[in-house]
Amino acid sequence: MSRRGTAEEKTAKSDPIYRNRLVNMLVNRILKHGKKSLAYQIIYRAVKKIQQKTETNPLSVLRQAIRGVTPDIAVKARRVGGSTHQVPIEIGSTQGKALAIRWLLAASRKRPGRNMAFKLSSELMDAAKGSGDAIRKKEETHRMAEANRAFAHFR
């Protein structure tokens, strides 16, 4: 048995303007090459665009988008007896949110458009409505888990 203690789970900090942890998680995932101020700029411009287009609280649109994209179940490759099976596993809320944010950013990067703030705002609004690439990715993951339900006992 290891003598080393377990690491304490860090609490997610909130961003300076909206005091929201989801915004901070989004900023940390969009971050490239340590340019955090640029990441904040992109997020805040995207939030402003959402507010202009929907004329509602942009944070509620963000929450709704992330809630819509968050998967309940995913598949994990597990090697059993020489063959690899895709085993469906349940996902916790924190890991689900992290996956949702990753999928939203990947989908917005793929979009054609002017700049990242525009693409991110469009993807967030689409996800809040229940469409877009990120929602498609979630549905695809759920379909994979459903198709491989027979291997659930390998968990």
From Swiss-Prot:
Main localization of the protein described in the UniProt heading: plastid
Subcellular localization, as worded in the UniProt entry: Plastid, Chloroplast
Family: Belongs to the universal ribosomal protein uS7 family.
Any single GO CC term annotated in Swiss-Prot or TrEMBL for this entry: chloroplast
Cited function: One of the primary rRNA binding proteins, it binds directly to 16S rRNA where it nucleates assembly of the head domain of the 30S subunit.
GO molecular function: rRNA binding; structural constituent of ribosome
PROSITE patterns for this protein: RIBOSOMAL_S7 (PS00052)
Subunit structure: Part of the 30S ribosomal subunit.
GO biological process assignments: translation
Pfam families xrefs: Ribosomal_S7
Name under which the protein is recorded: Small ribosomal subunit protein uS7c
Keywords attached to this entry: Chloroplast, Plastid, Ribonucleoprotein, Ribosomal protein, RNA-binding, rRNA-binding
